[in-house]
Amino acid sequence: TISLIQWNFFTQIYSDLIPRNINKDHWKKLYNKVSFCINKKIQLKKSWVNKSLSNNKFKYHNHTTDLTCVYILKNKYPEYGTRLDNDIIIEAKENSLLIFNGEVIHSITNMPKILGNKNPRYSIVMDFNYE
């Protein structure tokens, strides 16, 4: 188990986060919620946790999967959300789930230093392919 309080030195951790914990109730609940929202048979390819700080310089990128899901664990400033292709910013509200085509160019919105140093954003990212 990773405590958000103790997790001070990492900005990304475990690309196999969910498979390592798939039998735990909280992970089953999250996986089932994603499956329900998508309403198709899906296969998890990768999962990890991001910790976003002011010194992070997130760049635009995409994934090679059918779907990318971002679950926001903690984010005091939701306006610093996920930036999608063409500079569309989707707010990152705590306990929210963003699902989009993994091939869409996207990035985490970088926070100003004055905010990010004391208010990290924690998110769980999951990549899926359709079965």
Where are these regions (language model features)?
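Catalytic core of non-heme Fe(II) oxygenases with the double-stranded beta-helix
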Residues: K40-E131
